[in-house]
């Protein structure tokens, strides 16, 4: 066994028919954690249902269905390897909830793979003004996903045309530039997710294709395939040296064990013996044990989905959306209000002070009031365009003071990125995204401190 590979996370974005599932399925299938038996089982089922031509996407559909039914699916199924990395596919979107998931969940995305359908008409549909492609790319950029790979898919339907590929690269470059990406740092790969061209091996169908190049801090990087491009992702820096922040996804009551909050460590580490404070509930208690995938862990690090056992805390005290933090190291607090840079994506009317949509920030889902529009700014440069605007509309960016309707814990994006970005939901869709600039925290004394926390403090 060599040294464990570095983990990176990718999010696959693009229009619903761009072939994301097939492309992702193909990678997982060929370099992934799905064992041969499962593959054969899936293939047999797909063939019986006459879905033979759909096998890679079928693999993904099966995994999704199992994931949605809450079968704790072996997470290896969503992983594949490159020479350098162990890659986890966070979400292959195509659904309304994707945007929400992306904001609340992509703290972890190190790179976005934008899949674009090369077929005539398809590309245009995906990139049209209201296209999902645009929205996904804008989101990825706004949420700090700075690395991008563009996979121009379905090249087989263009008869492997070099002209079509070049045309798409040109259009897409203009498009991603508007979003904020620098096309020179992006690898453009012509592929067929279904036939496998330029996925792992160089395609013989496109002799004109000489490979991709991209600029990085270290210099120019070159490669041929999509796998090469993923392998050329710049390694992420994980925030384990920051204070602990762990937003709770759920809180379980487990007979014989007690209360077990579950969530992903976003920053810092969590380990047994630590005294944690939950905000905004303002409850402090000792962590008895930490586990992941039903195994005890010495410590949970950023990116780990963990369950941890806490004593003397009832399921009523803490809930989804609460944030666990180290009581001795910058403990999390309730936000009385916060200022954020908000980008309006798609709202049919105007938004003014008093607007009170639901914010999805990390795992919290709480209505917040736009108390004050402070200034309208240029989305790309951040320069002020207008002080105290009366209204903002789609396409605008502004600095807003927000006041939560219920106790909520958020942080500034600079200090704790995953807790500093949010989606604004209204009319069953994401109408805006935001990045938190500053938080006005309430200092509540007299929170509940459990006996086990007091004992742990005495031991120290």
UniProtKB/Swiss-Prot annotation:
Residues 192-194 are annotated as: G5. Disulfide bonds: none annotated. GO terms for cellular component: cytoplasm. The gene is TEF1. Belongs to the TRAFAC class translation factor GTPase superfamily. Classic translation factor GTPase family. EF-Tu/EF-1A subfamily. It comes from Schizophyllum commune (Split gill fungus). The keyword Kinase does not apply. This protein promotes the GTP-dependent binding of aminoacyl-tRNA to the A-site of ribosomes during protein biosynthesis. This is Elongation factor 1-alpha. The modification N,N,N-trimethylglycine is found at residue 2. It is found in: Cytoplasm.
């Amino acid at each position: 066994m060599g040294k464990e590979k570095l983990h990176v996370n990718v999010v696959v974005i693009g229009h619903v028919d761009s072939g994301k599932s097939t492309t992702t399925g193909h990678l997982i299938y060929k370099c992934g954690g799905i064992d041969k038996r499962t593959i054969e089982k899936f293939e047999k089922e797909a063939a019986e249902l006459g879905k033979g031509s759909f096998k890679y996407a079928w693999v993904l559909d099966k995994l999704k269905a199992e994931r949605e039914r809450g079968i704790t699916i072996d997470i290896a199924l969503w992983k594949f390897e490159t020479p350098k990395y162990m890659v986890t596919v966070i979400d292959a979107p195509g659904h309304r909830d994707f945007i929400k998931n992306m904001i609340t969940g992509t703290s972890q995305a190190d790179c976005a793979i934008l899949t674009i359908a090369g077929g005539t008409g398809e590309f245009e549909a995906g990139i049209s003004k209201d296209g999902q492609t645009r929205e996904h790319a804008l989101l990825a950029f706004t949420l700090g996903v700075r690395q991008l790979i563009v996979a121009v898919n379905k090249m087989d339907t263009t008869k492997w045309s070099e002209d079509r590929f070049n045309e798409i690269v040109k259009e897409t470059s203009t498009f991603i530039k508007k979003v904020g990406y620098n096309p020179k740092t992006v690898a453009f790969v012509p592929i067929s997710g279904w036939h496998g061209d330029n996925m792992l091996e160089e395609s013989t169908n496109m002799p004109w294709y000489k490979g991709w190049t991209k600029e990085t801090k270290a210099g120019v990087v070159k490669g041929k395939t999509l796998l090469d491009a993923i392998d050329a992702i710049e390694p992420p820096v994980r925030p384990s040296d920051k204070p602990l922040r762990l937003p709770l996804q759920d809180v379980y009551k487990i007979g014989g064990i007690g209360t077990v909050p579950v969530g992903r460590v976003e920053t810092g580490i969590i380990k047994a013996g630590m005294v944690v404070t939950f905000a905004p509930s303002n409850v402090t208690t000792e962590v008895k044990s930490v586990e992941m995938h039903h195994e005890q862990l010495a410590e949970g690090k950023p990116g780990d989905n963990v369950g941890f056992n806490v004593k003397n805390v009832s399921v009523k005290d803490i809930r989804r959306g609460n944030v666990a933090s180290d009581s001795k190291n910058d403990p999390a607090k309730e936000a009385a209000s916060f200022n954020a840079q908000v980008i309006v994506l798609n709202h049919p009317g105007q938004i003014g002070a008093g607007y009170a949509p639901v914010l999805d920030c990390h795992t919290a889902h709480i209505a917040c009031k736009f108390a004050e529009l402070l200034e309208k700014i240029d989305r790309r440069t951040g320069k002020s365009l207008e002080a105290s605007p009366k209204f903002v509309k789609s396409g605008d960016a502004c600095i807003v003071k927000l006041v939560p309707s219920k106790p909520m814990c958020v942080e500034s994006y600079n200090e704790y990125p995953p807790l500093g970005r949010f989606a604004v939901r209204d009319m069953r869709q994401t109408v805006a995204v935001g990045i938190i600039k500053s938080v006005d925290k309430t200092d509540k004394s007299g929170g509940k401190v459990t006996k086990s926390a007091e004992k742990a403090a005495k031991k120290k």
